A protein has these predicted regions:
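Alpha-helical substrate-recognition element adjacent to the catalytic core
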Residues: 2-121, 126
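C-terminal cap/substrate-recognition subdomain and adjoining C-terminal extension
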Residues: 77-91, 98-230
């Protein structure tokens, strides 16, 4: 019986070649955002508290935001990966602890308007200030987007392939059926014994996805257990 997969894909540092929120803060952030970052890195505050405080320190209007976002590059193989996932019947969602509007604008530039985006919301007040809302937060999770809750809610009958690179993916990686991992997430998977394959980018992910759906090939070249459902 062929395993049915869904794909949850991180954005910052995974699809994009840089962290979009950090890029916005470096260009438009008022003093104080780095101190919040230091508090988060040190574990004194959670990711949601950090991001909410940092977004409130963004300066500049929508045009200024667009100028920064329109310089952000994505992995050149990502569009081909999206096409392959669609052809294979694998629903793909962007699940990010970043900001929805920047992600949507960047993806739209590459013709990817159709991808579902589950992320924190970037809002602008009547007074022209930026703020963040977290509709996908959970009371027992410090992240703005609880990726574990998202995974549980999205087509639970399908096995989950997670693609990511960093700390916001650590918790959900332990619950996913398989992880395509890079950078910090790769180190975490290795240290925690989580089923994974290492990638440098989406060229690698394309090759691995082909292997994943070809059982005869996978048995010889993809030495990972096929998820078993009761």
């Amino acid at each position: 019986l062929r395993v049915q997969w869904k794909i949850l894909c991180d954005f910052d540092g995974t699809v994009s070649l840089q962290d979009v929120t950090d890029t916005l803060l470096e260009r438009l952030g008022q003093p104080g955002w780095r101190a919040l970052e230091d508090d988060w890195v040190a574990g004194r505050i959670g990711a949601r508290e950090c991001m909410s405080g940092q977004v409130a320190l963004l300066d500049g209007d929508v045009d200024a935001l667009h100028r920064v976002l329109d310089e952000v590059r994505i992995d050149p193989a990502f569009v081909r990966f999206v096409d392959l996932a669609r052809d294979l019947g694998m629903p793909l969602s962007i699940v990010s602890d970043g900001l929805d509007y920047p992600i949507a604008r960047i993806l739209a530039r590459h013709g990817l308007h159709q991808l579902p985006i589950i992320a924190n919301r970037l809002l602008r007040t009547d007074a022209g200030q930026w703020r963040m809302a977290s509709p996908h937060a959970q009371p027992d999770c410090a992240s703005g987007t609880c990726k574990c809750a998202v995974m549980a809610q999205q087509e639970p009958a399908r096995s989950t392939l997670l693609i990511g690179d960093g700390r916001s993916d650590f918790c959900v990686a332990g619950k996913a059926d398989l992880v395509f991992a890079k950078d910090g997430l790769l180190r975490h998977c290795r240290a925690s014994g989580i089923a994974h394959r290492a990638i440098d980018g989406f060229d690698d992910a394309i090759s691995l996805l082909h292997e994943l759906v070809a059982p005869a090939v996978a048995s010889a070249r993809f030495p990972l257990p096929v998820p078993q459902r009761a």
